[in-house]
Amino acid sequence: MAIPKDKEELVKAIEYNYKKLTIELSTIPTDLTTIKELEGHTKNTFMSINDLIAYLVGWGQLVLKWNDKKGKGLDVDFPETGYKWNELGLLAQKFYKDYEKDDFKTLNKKLDNTTFQILKLIESKANIELYEMAWYDKWTLGKMIQLNTSSPFKNAKDRIRKWKKINQLK
């Protein structure tokens, strides 16, 4: 799919990539979801399927947090309080830790809920708010949402497919 350029394309990209991701997730045996075999978000590290979902939930929740704080006129620490943009590997580790007690089913429910909340957020905004004004630095809100939802959903789907192929799973 092309990079979204407006509200309608953003919703379609999220829905499309999320659907493809959930199809891949639905065929994974639960007993394999905690094994750290996928290439991690930091060089020379590995993560589990559960870690990958935690990463997606973590970034989705950050998008919602950023929007909430901005909506209240509060300062937002991008990407997250205590982390700089050059420390995204550490932030990924934080997400894994934040959700380490959640099982595969719970993580999937959290991802469903987070994605639903983001789609509701998008629906509540006019296209001008999403794509016609800078929201963070030079980035629009729509671009920030896309970078933390539809693009990572596609990346996660591709990682899972590669992992399934290596492990001879369908």
Regions found by a protein language model. Give the residues of each.
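Amphipathic, heptad-repeat alpha-helices with coiled-coil/zipper character that mediate oligomerization
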Residues: 76-77, 116-118
